[in-house]
Structures are given as structure tokens and as C-alpha cells.
């Protein structure tokens, strides 16, 4: 369900909520000492943490006996260092006192001292893995210095050698605080070694006889099970042996299993966990050979990984491949569909450029002699090339810089690429013919960030979104709202609303906070986030426009893999209007007059951006 607005609708709750926020700010002097983040017993791996809270503006607030800085309204957000283990912080305001306990956990495994033992959870592979014959498999363990470490796998014994010190990379969120440089790690005493597996193994594929049809077909191919590795450690004359948790098998190259994508858009990644980057989603029905496994993750023959939960195995299927001969066009209202007739639904990828869209088909060989290329509203020319024996690349050269969204799907074995046309102005108002989706972030139990007085991000997001909606409607736009009340809505549901409603642009409205090691006292400003190339110009333009017109500090423009920036069906941008965590900026965020200025400026920026894109 979503909410569609194309005429002015009075919002009763907006005025009341603004009064509540005003009342909160006005009555700050009557409030007691409060710390809203972190809660006591918080655990973090950060080397420092900020504290968000407030107290009456008269008087002073101390943390562990040290006076801290506060805003004119009495809010504070100091950052303090953390030691490994338990850290206690005592907050004092006049005769009031709060104790907050924060535990810092280490990033590296704890090394046993002076005893023959492996560090807990340090043996790798930690999950069951499967590899092709002749591939390299590496083993590692953390053990005390001067240990003699080896691993036995089947009839092989592999020595594990101590490794030189390597730097640690911080979490991806460190890019949001500017503290993303490598961290010098203390010596972890990691022992590693590698070997090849299955080079001299032979595979037999058993046959299955169907008693009804009397036909004989290949059954499930036999895997070579090498079992779990045995790790051995010798120190000071004492030897221990520990069995690893991950079993190792070798896949049969004569009949690799074939997986079919069962989700609408299979999440392809660069490696076997959600820590790895996303690639172009695989359309439902895509078929691809499995060349490796890591736990629940499948390595696919074109190089990507996918969680097995998004696939099903097709028994007895041979490795999918196809030839391609022709390409067809279907011109529809507001969009063009390009049809690629294939023999099998193969993996694909898409890369957008400034005036191009490049589609790659894997496991595909061209037998193309001719295809039709009439004039098209958005495409100036289609080029193609066989970039390697199993990979065909199609380059759509476009007439204008701005792209308005695309979708991929399979109809049977034919791939359909849908490319959307630019909006057509159908009235006198500046945004006539434009549909804008507004997504007020969070909602329901998902409250988002919190201000020092307990103001919740979800509420402010909704207030601002309603104001933007009303301004957009006055300019002639049709507006879709993912929510218009305090309800919980999953990220997947929000994405589906974008894909189903096909807005001209989609904006997700948020207010910011920081990772634990951020400088909440000083970091503030307006920021925008984009993922697909088609959204970059909109993100950059709105950022620059709002920062200049409102004289707000710039937090920056970020490429970011966020659920509400990923939809490719429309240019999708996430806006962070300010920092709930900043003790000064929060006063602007909750001020009704500043809320109206922000909403109107964002709307003005949208109008100016459409004026600009229509010219080029």
C-alpha cells in the first residue's frame, strides 16, 4: 500500500506535532539530566564513543568530574576515548547523577598466553566449503608465538607459517566520519598455509533409471568429501589437535550443479557474505553453474556469489549457455523495451555511463548478422561486441545525459530490458507531468536516530515529508508517499513501492547520526546519497542547492549501498537533512519555521533540477 496525492490535502497532525516540538524546545530548562545514547551496558568495537543528552541550560554538566561543552539549549554530545573492556562514565548535573557503562570489545582474537591452545574461533575455513579440482585452499589459525602449527587434510599435511603483521581496515561506516585509514594492528600471531585440492581425483557420475519411462539419466554427481581439517599445535613440548569446523569437498567438473534464481532480483556479490559488495541483481529465472560453495553461499560460473536461499538446484541440468542472433524493440507509452531472444536465461550485468548504458550477457556467444535500429526517443545508437568467447556486450548510446530508470526481467528465455523515457510536461505548472515518491524514513518500532531530548527521527522525517509533499503538489507534481502515518514499513516494501509506482524520481527523507567513533559534537550538515549513476546528478544538485540557499554546512555527497538508493527503476536519492546527534543542529531540525524553509528549498531545488535536465 502507498499514498498517492495530486491535490492539496490538509494535514491536521502537522501543526499539532510542530507545537509539540516547539514545546519541547521551550521547556528544555525544566528537564532533568538525560542521556539518550548510549544506553548503559552498550557494547562497541570503536575506540571512542559520543554521548547524546541534555540538561537544563542553567548550571554545568560534568563527566567523570570534567566539565563538558553544551549548546545554548543545554544539549551535549562529547566524544570520549574507550579502553578495551569495561568503561564507566559518571554524569553529574547539580545533585543529579547518571552512570553509563560501555564495554569495548577487541577486533582481534585473544591469544592464549604460554599454553598450547588456539585462539577461540580462529580456525579457518570456519564453514563448509567446496572447490573445483586443482584450486587452492588456505588454512589459518591464531596461536601463541613460537608455536609449530600444521593441518592435516586427508592424506596431506600442510605446514602453517607465522605471517607478517598486516593492517586492519575499519568498517565501511568509517567513510562517514572521515576515519577510514588502515589501522596498525598489534601482532595477531596468525599462522597460514595453502594447498591444492582434488588434482588427482577421479569422479564418477552414477546413472538413474526411470522405471516408468525406462530411460537412463545422470543422477546427482558424486562429490569428493575430504572431511574436516585437523589442526595440530606444538608448544613447549606439548601437542594438541583440534578439528576444524568447516568440511572441504571437491566438485566434479564433468557435471557441475545448476542453480536457478528464485527471488525477483537475486543479490549477486563479489564474495561469500553480506560484507562483500553488490553486483547487478540477477533477474528471476536466471540459470548458472555452481563452481564453489562457502557455507550457504554459492560461487557462480561468471564470478559472482549468491546466497543459496535465493536459488533452487535443477537436478541433471547441464551448464547453461546460449547463442544470440537478433535484438528487438518494443515502443510503449513512456518506455522502450529491448528484447534479447536467448536459448537459456543467463547471468547479466549493467553499467551506466554519462550517456550510455552497457548490458553484458555472460555464457553467451553471438551469431548476429542483422537487427533493426529505428529512431528512438532516448537511444541514439546500439553497438555490440563479443568481448570474449563467452561474453557479449551491448552499449546503448543515449541522446541525453540523464537516464530515468531501467528494469530487467526474463520472459521465458528472452531477456527484457526496459528503459524509461523522460517525463513530458503536461501543464503550466513547473512540475506538471512529474511524479515524485517521498519516503519518510523509519516509522513504527523503527524510530531511527534520537535527539538529546528524545525527539525521534521517524517523527521529524514524516513532518518534513508532508511539508515537501504539499509544496510539490502546489508546483503541479503528483506525489507518492510510502507512509503517511507512524507505521512500520520494511525496506523491501519501500523498494517495491518505488518499483511498482515508477515515480520520475524517488527521495528518501532522513535525519542523520553517526557511528560510535564519530565526532557528534562537531559533525553536522546536509548530505545526499546515491547508488546508481542515473541518480548522481540529482544528488549533487540538491546538495549544492540546499547548502547554498539555506547557508547550511555541507556533510557531503556519498555513493552508498543503501536500500533506498539501490532501486534502478527510478533515479533514487536519500537525503540526510541534518544531524539529530549534533547539539546545535538539532535545534534547527525541530524548529517549525526551519522545517518549512527546508521543505520549500528542497522543492525549489527539484524544480530547478527538472528545468536544467529538460534543457540538456
Give the location of each predicted region.
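Active-site histidine-acidic residue metal-binding/catalytic motifs
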Residues: 418-505, 515-518, 522-524
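Active-site-adjacent mobile loop/cap segments within catalytic or ligand-binding domains
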Residues: 501, 505, 512-516, 527-530, ...
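Short beta-alpha junctions and helix-cap segments that line functional grooves
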Residues: 244, 491-495, 559-561
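Solvent-exposed loop/turn segments at secondary-structure junctions
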Residues: 423, 443-445, 485-489, 511-516, ...
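Short linear recognition/processing motifs and adjacent strand/loop elements at protein termini
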Residues: 2-15, 23-46, 58-60, 67-437, ...
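Soluble non-cytosolic domains of exported or imported proteins
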Residues: 45, 131-132, 272, 276, ...
Amino acid at each position: 500500500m502507498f499514498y498517492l496525492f495530486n491535490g492539496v490535502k490538509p494535514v491536521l497532525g502537522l501543526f499539532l506535532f510542530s507545537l509539540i516540538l516547539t514545546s519541547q524546545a521551550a521547556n528544555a530548562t525544566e528537564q532533568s539530566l538525560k542521556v539518550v545514547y548510549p544506553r548503559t551496558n552498550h557494547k562497541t568495537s570503536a575506540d571512542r564513543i559520543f554521548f547524546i543528552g541534555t540538561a537544563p541550560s542553567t548550571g554545568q554538566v560534568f563527566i567523570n568530574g570534567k566539565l563538558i561543552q553544551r549548546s545554548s539549549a543545554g544539549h551535549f554530545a562529547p566524544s570520549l576515548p574507550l579502553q578495551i573492556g569495561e568503561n564507566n562514565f559518571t554524569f553529574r548535573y547539580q545533585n543529579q547523577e547518571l552512570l553509563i557503562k560501555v564495554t569495548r570489545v577487541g577486533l582481534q582474537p585473544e591469544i592464549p598466553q604460554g599454553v598450547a591452545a588456539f585462539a577461540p574461533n580462529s580456525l579457518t575455513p570456519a564453514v563448509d566449503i567446496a572447490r573445483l579440482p586443482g584450486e587452492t585452499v588456505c588454512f589459518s589459525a591464531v596461536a601463541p608465538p613460537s608455536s609449530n602449527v600444521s593441518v592435516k587434510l586427508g592424506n596431506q599435511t600442510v605446514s602453517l607459517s607465522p605471517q607478517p603483521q598486516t593492517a586492519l581496515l575499519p568498517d565501511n561506516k568509517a567513510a562517514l566520519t572521515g576515519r577510514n585509514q588502515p589501522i596498525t594492528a598489534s601482532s595477531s600471531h596468525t599462522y597460514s598455509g595453502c594447498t591444492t585440492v582434488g588434482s588427482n581425483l577421479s569422479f564418477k557420475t552414477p546413472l538413474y533409471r526411470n522405471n516408468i519411462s525406462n530411460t537412463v539419466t545422470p543422477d546427482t554427481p558424486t562429490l569428493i568429501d575430504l572431511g574436516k581439517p585437523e589442526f595440530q599445535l606444538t608448544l613447549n613440548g606439548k601437542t594438541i589437535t583440534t578439528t576444524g569446523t568447516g568440511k572441504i569437498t571437491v566438485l566434479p567438473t564433468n557435471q557441475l550443479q545448476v542453480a536457478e534464481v528464485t527471488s525477483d532480483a537475486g543479490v549477486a556479490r563479489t564474495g561469500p557474505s553480506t560484507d562483500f559488495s553488490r553486483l547487478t541483481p540477477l533477474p528471476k529465472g536466471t540459470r548458472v553453474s555452481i563452481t564453489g560453495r562457502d557455507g550457504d553461499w554459492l560461487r557462480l560460473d561468471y564470478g559472482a556469489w549468491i546466497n543459496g536461499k535465493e536459488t533452487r538446484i535443477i537436478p541433471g541440468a547441464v551448464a547453461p549457455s546460449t547463442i544470440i542472433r537478433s535484438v528487438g524493440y518494443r515502443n510503449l507509452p513512456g518506455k522502450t523495451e529491448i528484447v534479447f531472444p536467448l536459448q537459456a536465461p543467463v547471468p547479466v550485468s549493467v553499467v551506466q555511463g554519462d550517456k550510455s548504458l552497457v548490458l553484458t550477457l555472460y555464457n553467451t556467444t553471438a551469431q548476429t548478422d542483422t537487427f533493426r535500429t529505428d529512431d528512438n526517443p532516448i537511444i541514439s545508437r546500439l553497438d555490440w561486441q563479443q568481448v570474449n568467447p563467452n561474453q557479449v556486450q551491448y552499449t546503448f548510446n543515449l541522446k541525453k545525459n540523464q537516464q530515468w530508470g531501467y528494469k530487467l526481467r526474463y520472459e521465458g528465455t528472452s531477456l527484457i530490458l526496459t528503459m524509461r523515457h523522460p517525463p513530458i510536461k503536461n501543464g503550466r505548472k513547473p512540475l506538471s507531468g512529474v511524479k515524485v515518491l517521498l519516503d519518510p524514513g523509519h516509522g513504527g518500532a523503527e524510530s531511527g536516530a534520537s535527539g538529546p531530548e528524545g525527539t525521534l527521527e521517524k517523527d521529524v522525517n514524516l513532518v518534513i515529508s508532508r511539508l515537501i509533499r504539499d509544496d510539490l503538489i502546489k508546483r503541479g507534481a503528483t506525489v507518492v508517499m510510502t507512509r503517511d502515518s507512524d507505521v512500520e514499513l520494511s525496506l523491501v516494501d519501500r523498494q517495491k513501492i518505488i518499483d511498482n509506482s515508477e515515480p520520475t524520481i524517488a527521495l528518501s527523507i532522513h535525519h542523520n547520526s553517526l557511528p560510535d567513533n564519530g565526532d557528534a559534537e562537531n559533525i553536522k550538515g546536509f548530505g545526499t546519497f546515491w547508488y546508481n549513476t542515473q541518480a548522481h546528478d540529482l544528488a549533487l544538485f540538491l546538495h549544492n542547492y540546499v547548502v547554498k540557499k539555506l547557508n547550511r554546512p555541507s556533510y557531503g555527497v556519498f555513493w552508498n549501498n543503501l536500500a533506498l538508493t539501490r532501486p534502478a527503476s527510478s533515479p533514487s536519492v536519500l537525503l540526510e537533512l541534518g544531524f539529530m546527534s549534533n547539539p546545535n543542529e538539532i535545534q534547527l531540525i525541530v524548529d517549525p519555521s526551519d522545517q518549512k524553509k527546508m521543505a520549500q528549498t528542497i522543492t525549489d531545488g527539484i524544480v530547478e533540477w527538472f528545468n536544467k535536465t529538460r534543457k540538456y
